[in-house]
Amino acid sequence: MNVLIVYYSLYGHVAAMAQAVAEGVHQVPGMTATLRRVPETLSEEVIGKMGATEAQKALSHVPACTLEELEDADAIVFGTPTRFGNMCGQMRQFLDATGQIWMRGGLVGKPGGVFCSTATQHGGQETTLMSFIQTLLHHGMIVVGLPYSFAGQMRLDEVTGGSPYGATTIAGGDGSRMPSENELDAARFQGRHIADVTRRLRA
């Protein structure tokens, strides 16, 4: 069974979390993970002005997701950077193209989850995840979060992302902070959890 991990990453933070989610999926026997990016909407000029050209080159080996892959997957986990407390425009545009899938109920009953990154500790992690989950519910998906059985989200000894709605990371205002090991552990846990739930549902 396949868990599709669909994400957008400009500087690599969400990509690192996506890779950790995939690692968690692979810990469950019989489960595989497929990494896909949503199509870019920014021009190369804009990406260059944002200082993201090298990061984008490093991520270019990951294929763009097709709408058909959404329906073929047994479960889907979405990852996005936060833009003013919501998912990024690239992800929104991709999901806004799923109207035909919605009409035929192509995602109904599939487990789904979300993870994200923000610049700051209180930069909209939970609002991004909660607003994203609304789209999953409209598609009839079964939302799988990050339960408190992952004890790392209770830590107070370091600045860390994570909430029951999904794994998160804090990038810093200048993007210099990459996901911590605790945040990557959260992503692995979420991947393993959604893979296990998917396997049980399909059994």
From Swiss-Prot:
Entries under PROSITE patterns matching the protein? FLAVODOXIN_LIKE
| Keywords, in A-Z order | Flavoprotein, FMN, NAD, NADP, Nucleotide-binding, Oxidoreductase
Q: Which InterPro entries match?
A: Flavodoxin/NO_synth, Flavoprotein-like_sf, Flavoprotein_WrbA-like, FMN_Rdtase-like_dom, NQO
The record lists NAD(+) as bound by Y11
Annotated catalysed reactions: a quinone + NADH + H(+) = a quinol + NAD(+); a quinone + NADPH + H(+) = a quinol + NADP(+)
Annotated EC:
1.6.5.2
Q: Which residues form the Flavodoxin-like domain?
A: 3-194
Q: Which Pfam families match?
A: FMN_red (PF03358)
Key word Ligase present in the record? no
User: Which residues of the sequence carry a binding annotation for FMN?
Assistant: 9-14, 82-84, 117-123, 138
Task: Give GO cellular component annotations, separated by semicolons.
Answer: membrane
Sequence positions that bind substrate: W102
Q: Name one GO molecular function term.
A: FMN binding
The cofactor remark states: Binds 1 FMN per monomer.
Q: Which cofactor does it need?
A: FMN
Regions annotated as coiled coil: none
User: What protein family is recorded?
Assistant: Belongs to the WrbA family.
- Return the PANTHER family for the record: FLAVODOXIN-RELATED PROTEIN WRBA-RELATED, FLAVOPROTEIN-LIKE PROTEIN YCP4-RELATED
Name by which UniProt lists this protein: NAD(P)H dehydrogenase (quinone)
Q: What is the lineage of its organism?
A: Bacteria, Pseudomonadati, Thermodesulfobacteriota, Desulfovibrionia, Desulfovibrionales
